[in-house]
Regions:
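A short, N-terminal "cap"/entry segment at the start of jelly-roll beta-barrel domains
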Residues: 1-31, 114-153
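Conserved short histidine dyad/triad with adjacent acidic residue
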Residues: 18-22, 35-51, 86
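Short, conserved beta-strand element in jelly-roll/cupin
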Residues: 36-40, 50-68, 106-110
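A generic structural motif
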Residues: 45, 55, 62-64, 71, ...
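Short hydrophobic/aromatic patches on the structural cores and recognition surfaces of FHA
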Residues: 63, 79, 93
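Short acidic-glycine-tyrosine-enriched beta hairpin
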Residues: 70-88
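Ligand-binding loop in jelly-roll beta-barrel domains
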Residues: 86-113
Length: 153
């Protein structure tokens, strides 16, 4: 059992570049990961992405943001709950407001994942759980045939 008392965890910056910036307070878990997340005003979470193995969910604590999917955008506010099943539609959070957007993020982590990025045409194979796992990112357009490069094929 692990107990994290309110206000005792350390915040750490997540992946950042350009319009992408959020920070996270890891709460722990083995198969079910949990973390407090804060998305700064005018920023986006991660690029539009879809997990093929990991299921994610979030519960909005404060602030407002929009969730972007291939079907459009939906505004989110305190008390809203979202679930993103593995293999489900791509998603991204966008905070176009003036206040931080805070949420509890949950993920069923299995130590590996395949993640698609529709906007950039990339695909990532992830070994290990976020944030310490290794990522191998490729452009989908540069796919190779199964036997490419094999001298015996």
């Amino acid at each position: 059992m692990k107990i994290v008392k309110n206000g005792t965890g350390a915040w750490a910056d997540s992946l950042q570049r350009g319009k992408y910036h959020q920070r996270r307070q890891e709460l722990g878990g083995e198969k079910l990961k949990a973390g407090l997340w804060e998305l700064a005003p005018g920023k986006k979470s991660f690029p539009l992405h879809a997990h093929q193995v990991t299921e994610e969910a979030l519960y909005v604590l404060s602030g407002k943001a929009k969730v972007r999917t291939p079907e459009g955008t939906t505004e989110l506010g305190p008390g809203d709950y979202l679930s993103f099943p593995a293999g489900g539609p791509a998603h991204q959070l966008v905070n176009d407001g003036k206040e931080p957007f805070r949420y509890l993020g949950l993920s069923a982590a299995f130590g590996h994942d395949l993640v698609e990025y529709p906007d950039s045409g990339k695909i990532a194979f992830v070994l290990g759980a976020y944030p310490t796992g290794k990522r191998f990112i490729f452009e989908k357009a540069k796919q190779a045939d199964y036997f490419d490069g094999d001298p015996d094929a």
